[in-house]
Structures are given as structure tokens and as C-alpha cells.
């Protein structure tokens, strides 16, 4: 009986050891280890109410071009996670309440009403689902910041308040379709809804602090390297 129990325990231990070794094996997959993406899109924006400078930046819901690039780490099932950034040079109508004084730490000039341009830049953490050969669906989720910089009056190039620009939190969700020319070369077309949340300091209760920015984007995604899994 003792010999039987000893033999049984040895079989259990050996089986457990072999199972642990199998679980620790590393396999190479055909999935890309990284994705590099470049895209161009058109977006609209409603505007920003800035209570600190008593100014409004009206984008007029006009369509403007936006350029995007991302670097993502490949994951399972065609998903990836990484960082992305966009840039757009945006025309807008600047208006300010000149009877409201600027804070002592604010810089830049103001106008009652004038045409101007600014640089709009975003930097986000991005999650992308959908990749591979042939047609496939896409889902994209972003979270990060939007920066409004270089607010300048068109007529004379004067820097408008706030002179240092402004940075707001930004969130985005998108859905679309892609076509894979190969497992590592994809063309994506995606519709996104993005919104930036501006600070409420100095705003009346009825003033909006949300800049809504829907967009359509065409992107080229290229996969590089390889990915391994442990089982």
C-alpha cells in the first residue's frame, strides 16, 4: 500500500511539473509587435469660452484638416495600445469683453472682435481594436489632453490672451472599418466623437465649457516586428 501511495504521489508531482513547464513555454506569433499609423482627417469644432480672459474662441463648426500619428504596442486579437498625437492650424473668431480686466498673471492682447488662428495639438493614450487582412470593424478609445497655442490675430499677428495658451482634458471614441492589404498593412476609415473640457473659472452658469469635435479620418497602419505569447 505504501509503495502504491508513493508511486501515485510521484506521478502527480511529475505531471504537475510537466504541466508547469508547458505553461511557461513561449511561442512566436505572426502578429506585429508594433503598429505605426499616419492619418489625415477633417474635423469640426464649436468653440471655447475662456472665463479667465473673458474671451470666446468661435470655431464656427467649420471643417478643418487635422494630422495624426501614433505608435502602438500590438496585443492579442488585432488590438493595440499606445500613444497618439494630432495637429491642426485652426481659424477662428476671437471676441472679448474688454470691460473685464485681465488677471495680473495673464499675458497677451485682446480685441472686441477679430479673426485669428491658433495651433490645436492633442496627445492621448489610445486603444485600437481591429486589424488583419481583409475587411474588419474598428473601435478606438482615446484619453489625454488638448493644447491651444499661438493664438494670433490675423491682421497684425498680435498674440492674443491667454498668451501662454491653454491645456484641457480630452476624450474620444471612434468606430469605423478597415481593409487589410496584408496582415501588416491596413487602411482605416473611422468616425470619431471628441470633446475637450475647459475650466469653468470665470464662466457664468449658462456658459458651455465643452468643445465638441466630431471628425472623419483616413489612416494607413503599418505593422512591424513580432509578438510572442507564453502558454
Please give the residue ranges for each predicted region:
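Short acidic, glycine/proline-rich loop/turn micro-motifs
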Residues: 48-53, 95-97, 151-157, 200-204
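Bacterial N-terminal signal peptides
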Residues: 7-15
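Short glycine/proline- and aromatic-enriched beta-strand/turn motifs that initiate or cap beta-hairpins
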Residues: 20-74, 143, 148-150, 213-231
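Gram-negative (and chloroplast) outer-membrane scaffold detector with strong preference
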Residues: 21-24, 70-158, 168, 215-227
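Transmembrane beta-barrel strands of outer-membrane/channel proteins
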Residues: 34-44, 83-89, 139-145, 175-177, ...
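Positively charged n-region of N-terminal signal peptides that target proteins for export
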Residues: 1-4
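Predominantly the C-terminal beta-signal and adjacent terminal strand-loop region
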Residues: 90-94, 173-231
Amino acid at each position: 500500500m505504501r509503495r502504491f501511495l508513493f508511486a501515485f504521489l510521484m506521478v502527480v508531482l511529475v505531471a504537475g511539473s510537466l504541466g508547469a513547464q508547458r505553461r511557461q513555454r513561449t511561442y512566436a506569433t505572426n502578429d506585429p509587435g508594433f503598429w505605426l499609423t499616419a492619418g489625415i482627417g477633417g474635423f469640426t469644432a464649436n468653440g471655447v469660452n475662456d472665463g479667465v480672459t473673458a474671451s470666446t474662441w468661435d470655431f464656427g463648426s467649420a471643417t478643418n484638416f487635422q494630422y495624426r500619428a501614433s505608435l502602438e504596442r500590438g496585443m492579442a486579437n488585432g488590438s493595440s495600445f499606445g500613444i497618439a498625437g494630432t495637429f491642426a492650424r485652426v481659424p477662428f473668431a476671437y471676441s472679448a469683453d474688454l470691460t473685464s480686466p485681465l488677471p495680473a498673471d495673464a499675458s497677451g492682447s485682446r480685441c472686441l472682435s477679430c479673426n485669428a488662428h491658433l495651433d490645436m495639438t492633442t496627445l492621448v493614450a489610445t486603444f485600437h481594436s481591429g486589424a488583419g487582412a481583409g475587411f474588419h470593424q474598428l473601435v478606438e478609445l482615446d484619453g489625454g489632453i488638448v493644447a491651444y497655442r499661438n493664438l494670433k490675430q490675423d491682421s497684425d499677428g498680435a498674440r492674443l490672451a491667454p498668451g501662454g495658451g491653454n491645456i484641457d482634458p480630452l476624450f474620444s471614441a471612434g468606430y469605423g472599418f478597415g481593409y487589410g492589404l496584408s496582415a501588416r498593412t491596413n487602411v482605416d476609415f473611422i468616425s470619431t466623437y471628441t470633446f475637450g473640457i475647459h475650466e469653468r473659472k470665470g464662466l457664468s452658469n449658462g456658459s458651455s465649457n465643452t468643445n465638441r469635435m466630431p471628425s472623419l479620418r483616413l489612416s494607413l497602419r503599418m505593422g512591424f516586428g513580432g509578438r510572442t505569447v507564453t502558454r
